[in-house]
Amino acid sequence: MSFALGLTGSIGMGKSTTAAMFRDLDVPVWDADATVHKLYARGGAAVAPIDALVPGAMKDGAIDRAVLRAAIADDASLLKQIEAIVHPLVAKDRAMFRDIHSTAPLIILDIPLLFETGGDAACDATLVVTTSPEEQRRRVLARGTSEDTLHDLLSRQMPDAEKRARATYVIETDTLDGTRQDVAHLVSKLTEGT
């Protein structure tokens, strides 16, 4: 069975860029966000059950995330019900990924809320990517996100310091070259002797 490294980091910390660096080194990467998007897309396994729970959430055969967010804002109890639909489907997709890549020496499980959802229990080790609060803010605002939205997103995530304290490995993502070197070093370390 492959060594599973859970990858996480708060918004703007460089998680997607780091995941791409693992892919560039031919390490299979499973992306929780992409899986949820697939489940919400036309023909996705979550579409019908969510539409039954939140009438009108389906538009053109797919889940309209804005409608879903508005429904959750109106009735917070919906979130747990939606999670009860989505989480088992995500776990099934992750298990299929692990089966497909069972002979790979290393796989990455890219899970934004790794610690918050208990996803770290499915991992052999965890990696948190981090940068300074100033750089994080600069990156997120450069995407067109407002200060208020950034504050709201961060308030719903585990603080970076706590993530770093819980992580097996931490990579500072201040520079692309430094991050690339750290990723390559970690891949070598975790695949030595395989």
Swiss-Prot record:
Q: Which residues does the record give as ATP binding sites?
A: 12-17
Q: What is this protein's gene name? A: coaE
Q: Which domain of life is it from?
A: Bacteria
Compartment(s) where it occurs, according to its Swiss-Prot or TrEMBL record: Cytoplasm
Identify the HAMAP family for this entry.
Dephospho_CoA_kinase
According to its UniProt record, this protein's enzyme class is: transferase
Protein name per Swiss-Prot or TrEMBL: Dephospho-CoA kinase
Q: In which pathway does it act?
A: Cofactor biosynthesis; coenzyme A biosynthesis; CoA from (R)-pantothenate: step 5/5
Q: Which organism is it from?
A: Jannaschia sp. (strain CCS1)
Q: Which residues cross the membrane?
A: none
GO BP field: coenzyme A biosynthetic process
UniProt main location, coarse:
cytoplasm
- Protein family according to the UniProt entry: Belongs to the CoaE family.
- What does this gene product do? Catalyzes the phosphorylation of the 3'-hydroxyl group of dephosphocoenzyme A to form coenzyme A.
Which keywords appear in this protein's UniProt record, sorted alphabetically?
A: ATP-binding, Coenzyme A biosynthesis, Cytoplasm, Kinase, Nucleotide-binding, Transferase
**Gene Ontology molecular function terms on file:** ATP binding; dephospho-CoA kinase activity
Ranges for domain DPCK? 4-194
EC number(s) of the enzyme? 2.7.1.24
Q: Does the keyword Transferase apply?
A: yes
